[in-house]
Amino acid sequence: MSNFINIHVLISHSPSCLNRDDMNMQKDAIFGGKRRVRISSQSLKRAMRKSGYYAQNIGESSLRTIHLAQLRDVLRQKLGERFDQKIIDKTLALLSGKSVDEAEKISADAVTPWVVGEIAWFCEQVAKAEADNLDDKKLLKVLKEDIAAIRVNLQQGVDIALSGRMATSGMMTELGKVDGAMSIAHAITTHQVDSDIDWFTAVDDLQEQGSAHLGTQEFSSGVFYRYANINLAQLQENLGGASREQALEIATHVVHMLATEVPGAKQRTYAAFNPADMVMVNFSDMPLSMANAFEKAVKAKDGFLQPSIQAFNQYWDRVANGYGLNGAAAQFSLSDVDPITAQVKQMPTLEQLKSWVRNNGEA
């Protein structure tokens, strides 16, 4: 049974500036000797986990912060009815390796994702340890013997199970590290891009000349290739031994978000809220990106979208034949481009593609 789900998306963005660097310019990359506009994987992942769809279908995302004092206050508010304040503070101190007192500024060593439900479970263990007169070392030993019990709590923090978690201090270094089950590539345009510059003014209505500020902003449009894969076995392990069905359900939602969610940068100015034009999912025994379909930059032919889908389909056929791919595969497309090889099921709607993923690649 195939362990990896590969998700391929082609999405055409109208003029926009969805991801910028430290110089306030569009992020880019050289691929195939040509400049491509780029949207970082970090930007895509944040857009997904902060989306309304994520909240409605997966649940509350983790709290990512370096500011432990603020986290302490949030935990006191959310868990105060269940646990004594001293237990909450001690639990956070043990997990972070930092003294959590009444100081206003307490910083962790790095930005870390925290799950309220997971911390509540740790509070229960700390309270029980105090009742049993266990010191911190004995408590750590007891907890290390059943990591799976800890991982079950990540069902309330699926984004950590997907993207992973690094810990550099406290008990989290031994109990909280998670190898992410999902990999997301930086999205790049399928074609070369020469950006434009928007010259803009901020108008002062009370001044005769009108202008209060002059500025410039780089922007462009383009067809982007997005790619992600999910290691189903790793996801099951990260969720404390979840079933394959549970992992497939989460993968289904990732497919939806990768096809529909867009980073929010400059969106009040450009409103590039474009849905995906093509989504393909395939099951395989290894991660499999189709980015090399665009190593030779696509040339415009009545736009870039149609030739990009054609380039993808043709490259997929070559890879599938050359490597003998026989895992289930399905594609949803808004385009009238000739369909991909017959071995790839054609889905009329995104919802039908999601149902196919949910059913383990079966109609």
Curated annotation (Swiss-Prot):
GO (cellular component) term, any one: protein-containing complex
Coiled coil: none
InterPro entries: CRISPR-assoc_prot_CT1975
Molecular function GO labels: DNA/RNA hybrid binding; RNA binding
Database matches in Pfam families: Cas_CT1975
Keyword RNA-binding: yes
Keywords for this protein: Antiviral defense, RNA-binding
Signal sequence segment: none
Source organism superkingdom: Bacteria
Induction annotation: Repressed by H-NS, activated by LeuO. Activated by the BaeSR two-component regulatory system, possibly due to envelope stress. Part of the casABCDE-ygbT-ygbF operon.
Any one biological process term the GO annotation gives: defense response to virus
CDD domains listed in its UniProt record: Cas7_I-E
Record note on disruption phenotype: Loss of resistance to bacteriophage lambda infection, loss of plasmid silencing. Increased levels of 57 nucleotide crRNA and also 2 and 3 spacer-repeat units.
Stated role: CRISPR (clustered regularly interspaced short palindromic repeat), is an adaptive immune system that provides protection against mobile genetic elements (viruses, transposable elements and conjugative plasmids). CRISPR clusters contain sequences complementary to antecedent mobile elements and target invading nucleic acids. CRISPR clusters are transcribed and processed into CRISPR RNA (crRNA). A component of Cascade, which participates in CRISPR interference, the third stage of CRISPR immunity. Cascade binds both crRNA and in a sequence-specific manner negatively supercoiled dsDNA target. This leads to the formation of an R-loop in which the crRNA binds the target DNA, displacing the noncomplementary strand. Cas3 is recruited to Cascade, nicks target DNA and then unwinds and cleaves the target, leading to DNA degradation and invader neutralization. CasCDE alone is also able to form R-loops.
Quaternary state and interactors: Part of the Cascade ribonucleoprotein complex, with stoichiometry CasA(1),CasB(2),CasC(6),CasD(1),CasE(1)-crRNA(1). The 6 CasC subunits make a helical stack forming a groove in which the crRNA lies. Interacts directly with all of the Cas subunits. Stable subcomplexes of CasBCDE-crRNA and CasCDE-crRNA also form, both of which are able to bind target dsDNA, and at least CasCDE is able to form R-loops. CasCDE and CasCE complexes have endonuclease activity. Interacts with YgbT (Cas1). Binding of target ssRNA or dsDNA causes a conformational change in the Cascade complex.
Protein name: CRISPR system Cascade subunit CasC
